[in-house]
Amino acid sequence: MPFGNTHNKWKLNYSAAEEFPDLSKHNNHMAKALTLDIYKKLRDKETPSGFTLDDIIQTGVDNPGHPFIMTVGCVAGDEECYEVFKDLFDPVIEDRHGGYKPTDKHKTDLNQENLKGGDDLDPNYVLSSRVRTGRSIKGIALPPHCSRGERRLVEKLCIDGLATLTGEFQGKYYPLSSMSDAEQQQLIDDHFLFDKPISPLLLASGMARDWPDGRGIWHNNDKTFLVWVNEEDHLRVISMQKGGNMKEVFRRFCVGLKKIEDIFVKAGRGFMWNEHLGYVLTCPSNLGTGLRGGVHVKIPHLCKHEKFSEVLKRTRLQKRGTGGVDTAAVGSIYDISNADRLGFSEVEQVQMVVDGVKLMVEMEKRLENGKSIDDLMPAQK
């Protein structure tokens, strides 16, 4: 849990070696990047809002990692973190985002017209389609570090702004604090709402403080466009629907996101963005587009095939269980999404999902008929 700066200054009574965390059993990007020299150099620094190196790394110290998934192991507490503590964040970002250099520039493309295809994914295999991203409001500390007042301000800005949306985006805000446990659970089971903050990563980073104060969900009347407020990021914007029409999901995502950004800019509150990191978010894994385009696809034959993981690697996609990270695939239904966030535009990332999933469905149909998929193996993207 993040401490005040007085506590950080008190720690300086001890040497860097005495304060350096034991990372000997850790499997995360932070543990890989953090050396005693870096710790020594950065331990007395703090951002203007008072976030420190120990605040950044605490979640990765407390959670050594996952046997199959390399976790990130650090979070940002405000926009300035990525600059003040770049000696740690730069190697973490480079390692997590496939060699993305401190001098690289990120590209943004939210023009849905540039997506090719995506309206013809076979609904017998592709059960649902979803695109999400995160956004952070300039001048307000991020969830690991924000005060109650800041968090409530984010919520108020969202309530006031989203209430002005019309047409297909007209909807309503539901604060978590006034929901019954049964209502919350139903929304979680329907994949509309974030889980309760029981994840050790959320707890150790300080993101679950004061729960459920200032948290909520807004969705349009059709429940196809949602905004999560004050979970891991200030805003999580989600477009989703049943079936395989990723083109329509992406169109709604781009149009709705633009409307939301315009509302915040008009209120004098733009989103955190820079040309190196793209959209600035709490977890370094989401920098860039913050975008995850995913489908639930049923592939009972392909998922057992020896080349399944190679197909994923070559198409730059990743698999999760039916319920998301750390869950099992129920009935051979996998959540397949883009592996990249930084260095590729939104259109490029969704295009990879569309093309890769289309190929997987084709492979599944081949395997159903007892045929080989060797000639369908893609080149490395």
From Swiss-Prot:
E.C. number(s) listed in UniProt: 2.7.3.2
PROSITE patterns assigned to the protein according to its UniProt record, in alphabetical order = PHOSPHAGEN_KINASE, PHOSPHAGEN_KINASE_C, PHOSPHAGEN_KINASE_N
Residue span(s) of domain Phosphagen kinase C-terminal: 125-367
One GO cellular component term of this record is: extracellular space
User: What would be an example GO MF term here?
Assistant: creatine kinase activity
Keyword list, A-Z = ATP-binding, Cytoplasm, Kinase, Nucleotide-binding, Transferase
Which InterPro entries does the record cross-reference, listed alphabetically?
ATP-guanido_PTrfase, ATP-guanido_PTrfase_AS, ATP-guanido_PTrfase_cat, ATP-guanido_PTrfase_N, ATP-guanido_PTrfase_N_sf, Gln_synth/guanido_kin_cat_dom
Name the positions where ATP binds.
128-132, 191, 236, 292, 320-325, 335
**Major localization class:** cytoplasm
Record-linked CDD domains: creatine_kinase_like
Ranges for domain Phosphagen kinase N-terminal come to 11-98
Places the protein is found? Cytoplasm
Report if keyword Kinase is assigned: yes
Keyword Nucleotide-binding applies: yes
Catalytic activity, reaction form: creatine + ATP = N-phosphocreatine + ADP + H(+)
Give the record's GO biological process terms. phosphocreatine biosynthetic process
Give the main EC class. Answer: transferase
Q: Which family does it belong to?
A: Belongs to the ATP:guanido phosphotransferase family.
Miscellaneous comment in the UniProt entry for this protein: This electric ray muscle-specific creatine kinase (MM isozyme) is isolated from the electric organ, which derives embryologically from skeletal muscle. It may be involved in the electrical discharge process.
**Biological function:** Reversibly catalyzes the transfer of phosphate between ATP and various phosphogens (e.g. creatine phosphate). Creatine kinase isoenzymes play a central role in energy transduction in tissues with large, fluctuating energy demands, such as skeletal muscle, heart, brain and spermatozoa.
Assembly, per entry: Dimer of identical or non-identical chains. With MM being the major form in skeletal muscle and myocardium, MB existing in myocardium, and BB existing in many tissues, especially brain.
Q: What is this protein called?
A: Creatine kinase M-type
**What organism is listed for this UniProt entry?**
Tetronarce californica (Pacific electric ray)
